Amino acid sequence: VGLIKENKKHQELFVDICSEKDNLREELKKRTETEKQHMNTIKQLESRIEELNKEVNASRDKLVAQDVTAKNAIQQLHKEMAQRMEQANKKCEEARQEKEAMVMKYVRGEKESLDLRKEKETLEKKLRDANKELEKNTNKIKQLSQEKGRLHQLYETKEGETTRLIREIDKLKEDINSHVIEVKWAQNKLKAEMDSHKETKDKLKETTTKLTQAKEEADQIRKNCQDMIKTYQESEEIKSNELDAKLRVTKGELEKQMQEKSDQLEMHHAKIKELEDLKRTFKEGMDELRTLRTKVKCLEDERLRTEDELSKYKEIINRQKAEIQNLLDKVKIVDQLQEQLQRGKQEIENLKEEVESLNSLISDLQKDIEGSRKRESELLLFTERLTSKNAQLQSESNSLQSQFDKLSCSESQLQSQCEQMKQTNINLESRLLKEEELRKEEVQTLQAELTCRQTEVKALSTQVEELKDELVTQRRKHASSIKDLTKQLQQARRKLDQVENGSYDKEVSSMGSRSSSSGSLNARSSAEDRSPENTGSSVAVDNFPQVDKAMLIERIVRLQKAHARKNEKIEFMEDHIKQLVEEIRKKTKIIQSYILREESGTLSSEASDFNKVHLSRRGGIMASLYTSHPADNGLTLELSLEINRKLQAVLEDTLLKNITLKENLQTLGTEIERLIKHQHELEQRTKKT
């Protein structure tokens, strides 16, 4: 029983080790998968960052082009205003020169005044058009400032995305560190299990010593039984043929028991071989653990590589930040250009004031118009020149409008690209949320599995403790029954020389029933010892991982066949034991009925008759019992009644002991059936798992 327990413990330890190996493999697979997923996400993010960089570069180029075009337009406006100022100055000088000749040309001056009024109106129209163009340019500048704000927002969103990516990278680092800690914890657990395996080896040695002691005790019991059988044979040589047949049957049963014990020894040797095989498999498992450790080292190296890559990505992000700062500097330059535009506006206002002053001069000149009529023809030519210049200015304004339209188209394209970037960012955020939810669900499922396994482990531990307690109680009961049997044998030896033939026969019949009951108990216990060994071996063999699948399948099939054969043998032995018990009961009933029918003297042997004659010749109380007349004066009714009372007390004690033994046998039978059912349930569970 101790060997069975220790074998079960070894098997449970190996099963736990194998399950932990499988769990570690599954965890490594999951980690590799998660690392692959993280690498894929990192690659996707890298590609996305490259695309964003390309878009940023394109936007930069567009901004540079827009800045260049705006600068060119401003320079052209400045040139045009300078030309106009030069022309106005020239006109003023010409007007001053013409003042001297205006006196002579008063008649022509009136006509020229009318023409000048017309020219004034045209100039006012031109000023209005110029103001409108300035307003348009201011609106364009406002739109450019709005675009600048949008670009700032885009840069800020990109910076937020970079910070999120950095946080995700930090989370991945923390996950990798947690996985490394779990691997170390598993290694420590394996070391503890190795220490427990050493303790189990020491327990095996102790159990072998206990087995040798038990064998010696069994040999002594056999010798005592053989001595008893010899004494019975010497005293009952002239009994009936039925008793001889019973003795032969008992001898056959004893031989069968001897054979069963030899089979048990063979099973013990087989178990020792199986333990050696288990040691080999344990060594193989240790080699596999070493390989797993090497894999863990490789994973750590990969983790270091990933950390280096993350540092590189951080450097890239810092570079991008520097580029963003450069862009902000460029935006500041654009602000400076806006300030320059405002200055140009102020200059235009100053020019307007100068124009008003010129208008005042024109009003002064109107007084001198009378002398300016002579230059009508020249003024007409001047008007023609002004019309040509107006046409040129209109063509230039049309070109500026076309440039403005182009800039508006580029702005619309940039806005569409910004919207696409926003949509891609939203999609990425939704994907990240989905991945987080999936990982949370995986964690919850793993926690539920852990709780279920912990409950199963607790239930199995409670069952093991209950089985241990039941085995201890069975051992105690067996020890008490053996003690009772030894006491009864000693009492029978003592009473062989004192008790009469009738009482002798009754005691012999009771002893025969006891021996048969003890034989049935041994048979059942041997069957029970075999069944858990078989189940244990099957469980131990079924739980060997790390071997080729084909070898595992072949070995499982062989072990299942051997297990089925052993189960058939056990069932056959149980049926055979039941049949033997039924036959013994029938024979006991026949013997009891035969003894009740026949007289005590007919069943006695010739040796007992010679003993009776010898005692009757000697005289005394026993002689008066064996003869019809009193041979001793000391024998009285009181003495005879006391003797009868003592004999009745002995009979009552034997009957009570027989009843208790029957009850113990019944309880043992029920417990054995319960243990067999429990064993079958455990086998079914192991097969299902």
Swiss-Prot record:
| GO MF term set | small GTPase binding
Q: Where is the composition biased (Low complexity)?
A: 509-525
Source domain of life: Eukaryota
Q: Which residues form a coiled coil?
A: 20-503, 550-594, 646-685
Q: A Gene Ontology CC term for this entry?
A: trans-Golgi network
Presence of the UniProt keyword Coiled coil in the record: yes
Keyword Transferase recorded: no
List modified residues, type Phosphoserine.
531
- Any one GO biological process: vesicle cytoskeletal trafficking
- Keywords, ordered alphabetically: Coiled coil, Phosphoprotein
Q: Where is this region: Disordered?
A: 493-541
Question: What name appears for this protein in its UniProt entry?
Answer: Coiled-coil domain-containing protein 186
The organism is Pongo abelii (Sumatran orangutan)
Its lineage opens with: Eukaryota, Metazoa, Chordata, Craniata, Vertebrata
Gene, per the UniProt record? CCDC186
